[in-house]
């Protein structure tokens, strides 16, 4: 009986030599999710099959026209049916969180402009972001499975086709936005932020950071561009806190207009509320966090205004839906960051007012109320954002738990225990930040009531690749 030898998924091509390790250097170089379960094929050249001969003239034609670089890219095109399935999933689950185009508009693009490079790669990137957010995969009729990571890598390897320094800016911007969502879900913070900067750079080059650029556009075009602008604004402000880079987008651009819809899956209410949550603090707030310093425009009164205005969410939002979860944790996160800035400005004298000292406990209690009422499956859709935001609240609380008087300290410790249980139950991408939290608890002589070890995200990068 012949013993079957196995090889890397990437290296099973006959002419590629594999060093026998799993994954090999080529798998790592191309960020390929290797299973090492492919039958090893004989090395050496392989005669061209009859079915392959017909692709040679097509490949030459595409190369001569500079619209395609290799015949392989023709053969790797994602089937329409797979993209359409992703578009339906996006419509049903994710449009309320990051609204770009409705299913009808996306399906029309798929039918009419599938062969347009800019449109095609946007639809592939949207499919990748959708599968990444929902942590799922789809299988084509040929039995090949598509995951968000695979589609994102395919997009990045074909980047010259949709970003050739010309063409349709809006599709390039949306493509980069979708790709940054894919990389944020795989905990690749550096590349996710890099893609965010690519999209913002295109926004600025196209003049979309100036309101007058929208005046000559139709209402539909304005709506789409305003949605994209504010999606990037929210993303940039989130990353500014952890990448420590000041923001470039501000609220001089008007948000999109409300739309009358009968389908709740197309409602923009959650998106409008998220815009409110991230714009109430103002640009100076996030820049102060990025530079770890406070400016004259970021005063104690303006920070206290954040606590008050973000205390509750809009009544228009359906409680404990996909949209509500992200809004809820973002409110608690920003209020905790504002509390830390006030504490940084005033030092220990801040605790002379008992009400000030109790604000952080109230923030943590509000977060616990939402935690107890939220189904667990809703957290995963938002990827690393929920663990990071909840960990920020827990970090702030442990910093000051020993500064309370005896009665308040006991309450704060009990709340910290409940918050830490939730934090430890999530998948985390930032190991360093989590270890600092554990060290702080030990230094404060607090024993965390955790019975199981820290659960890291399976896709987490090495510590050197993670923004601390």
UniProtKB/Swiss-Prot annotation:
InterPro entries: Carb_Metab_Trans_Reg, Maltose_ferment_reg_DNA-bd, Transcription_factor_dom_fun, Zn2-C6_fun-type_DNA-bd_sf, Zn2Cys6_DnaBD. One of its GO terms (molecular function) is DNA binding. It is found in: Nucleus. Keywords: Activator, DNA-binding, Maltose metabolism, Metal-binding, Nucleus, Transcription, Transcription regulation, Zinc. GO terms for biological process: DNA-templated transcription; maltose metabolic process; regulation of DNA-templated transcription. The keyword Nucleus applies. One of its GO terms (cellular component) is nucleus. Pfam families: Fungal_trans, Zn_clus. It comes from the Eukaryota. The keyword DNA-binding applies. Residues 8-34 bind DNA. Its main location: nucleus. A motif (Nuclear localization signal) lies at residues 41-49. Regulates the coordinate transcription of structural MAL3S (maltase) and MAL3T (maltose permease) genes. Belongs to the MAL13 family. This is Maltose fermentation regulatory protein MAL33.
């Amino acid at each position: 009986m012949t013993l079957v030898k196995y090889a890397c998924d990437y290296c099973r091509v006959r002419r590629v030599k594999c060093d026998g390790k799993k994954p090999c250097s080529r798998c790592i170089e191309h960020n390929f999710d290797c299973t090492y379960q492919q039958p090893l094929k004989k090395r050496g050249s392989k005669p061209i099959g009859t079915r392959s001969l017909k692709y040679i003239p097509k490949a030459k034609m595409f190369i001569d026209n500079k619209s395609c670089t290799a015949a392989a890219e023709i053969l790797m095109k994602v089937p329409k049916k797979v993209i359409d399935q992703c578009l339906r999933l996006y419509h049903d689950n994710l449009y309320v969180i990051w609204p770009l185009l409705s299913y009808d508009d996306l399906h029309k693009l798929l039918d009419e402009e599938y062969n347009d490079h800019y449109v095609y790669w946007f639809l592939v990137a949207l499919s990748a972001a959708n599968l990444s957010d929902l942590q799922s995969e789809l299988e084509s009729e040929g039995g090949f499975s598509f995951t968000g990571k695979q589609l994102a890598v395919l997009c990045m390897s074909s980047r010259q086709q949709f970003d050739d320094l010309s063409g349709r800016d809006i599709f390039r911007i949306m493509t980069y936005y979708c790709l940054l969502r894919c990389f944020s879900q795989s905990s690749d913070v550096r590349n996710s932020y890099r893609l965010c900067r690519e999209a913002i750079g295109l926004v600025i080059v196209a003049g979309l950071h100036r309101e007058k650029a929208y005046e000559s556009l139709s209402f539909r075009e304005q709506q789409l561009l305003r949605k994209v602008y504010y999606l990037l604004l929210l993303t940039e402000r989130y990353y500014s806190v952890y990448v420590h880079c000041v923001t470039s987008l501000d609220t001089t651009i008007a948000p999109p207009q409300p739309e009358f819809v009968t389908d709740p899956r197309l409602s923009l209410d959650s998106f409008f509320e998220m815009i409110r949550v991230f714009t109430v603090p103002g640009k100076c707030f996030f820049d102060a966090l990025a530079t770890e310093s406070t400016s004259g425009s970021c005063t104690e009164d303006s920070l206290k205004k954040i606590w008050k205005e973000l205390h509750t969410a809009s009544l228009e939002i359906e409680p404990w839906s996909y949209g509500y979860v992200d809004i809820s944790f973002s409110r608690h996160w920003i209020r905790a960051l504002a509390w830390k800035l006030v504490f940084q400005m005033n030092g220990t004298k801040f605790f002379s007012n008992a009400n000030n000292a109790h604000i952080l406990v109230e923030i943590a209690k509000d977060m616990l109320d939402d935690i107890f009422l939220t189904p667990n499956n809703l957290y995963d859709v938002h990827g690393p954002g929920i663990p990071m935001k909840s960990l920020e609240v827990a970090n702030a609380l442990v910093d000051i738990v020993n500064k309370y008087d005896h009665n308040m300290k006991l309450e704060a410790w009990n709340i910290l225990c409940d918050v830490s249980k939730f934090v430890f139950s999530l998948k985390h991408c930032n190991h360093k930040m989590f270890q600092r939290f554990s060290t702080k608890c030990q230094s404060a002589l607090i024993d965390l009531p955790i019975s199981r070890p820290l659960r890291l995200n399976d896709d987490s990068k090495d510590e050197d690749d993670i923004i601390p």
